[in-house]
Amino acid sequence: LIPEPLQYLLFVGFAALMFLLRLDARRFSAAEWDTEDGEWRIWLSRLSWYGAGLALALIIFALHPSPVSELNLTLAPDRGFAMALGLLYGAAGVVGAFVLAVFLNGRISFPSPGRYPGGVLFAVGTAFFDEFLFRGVLFGLLLVLGLPEWLAIGSAAFIYAGAVRAGTGSRGLVLLLNWMIIGVIGSVLVLMTGGIAAAFVGHAITRFAFFMTMGTPRRAAVEQVQPRSRGSGDAGAYVIGRRDIRRG
């Protein structure tokens, strides 16, 4: 048997590794709805990220002496109530995703059907990763340390929003506030239900709604210059800017 101090130290170490993996999600083309379709190497990279996250989650759960009572790493004592709250959260998330898509892009951009399997993987895998780490481990540790509930909720949401921003490269204030709201709602649901099931269900639905409304890859501004045809002057040259590239 591992001595308890060493066991807890290992728990903190593996939790830190999982946090670092979340920060490095962009390198694996994972954890964001706007990743490109790609060849098998890209898919292998994405799957390795989700697989590593699941493995770390299992190790963390095994190492902590009281993962259920202290970290709420369980579905919920009342699963029916948790499921109802999760679906309600998801419904609000769907509405929010459509509003956000119109606000940011001016229109809804539905992805091609061939991208749906990746969208499902993104939604379910990332929601589990985030809820386990941020609403389970991190939020639970903040409560164990004696922080008031409101301060623990705000701190966990702030750290979560910063981690998502670092891991996806998004820089907009609107998206940052969006992740903050997701973090706050998830933590509140954990307090209400005693588990992460409601937060996971609602988060997964919300992320899939993001994929459905903003699922086509974001691209940086690209400058393309066509060969000039004789006698055409500059007619053959054109620039495609950020506003000229549509999602869809």
Where are these regions (language model features)?
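N-terminal, membrane-interfacial amphipathic/helix-forming hydrophobic leader that caps
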Residues: 1-73, 144, 151, 211-248
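Alpha-helical transmembrane segments
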Residues: 3-13, 78-92
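Helix-boundary and loop/linker segments of multi-pass membrane transporters
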Residues: 4, 74-78, 108-116, 145-146
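Transmembrane helix-loop-helix hairpins at the membrane interface
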Residues: 19, 98, 102, 112-248
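Membrane-interface helix-boundary motifs at transmembrane edges
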Residues: 32-41, 106-114, 170-173
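Transmembrane alpha-helical segments of multi-pass membrane proteins
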Residues: 41-52, 81, 115-126
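Alpha-helical transmembrane segments of multi-pass integral membrane proteins
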Residues: 53-60, 85-100, 121-130
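Membrane-helix interface/capping segments
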Residues: 67-73, 103-110
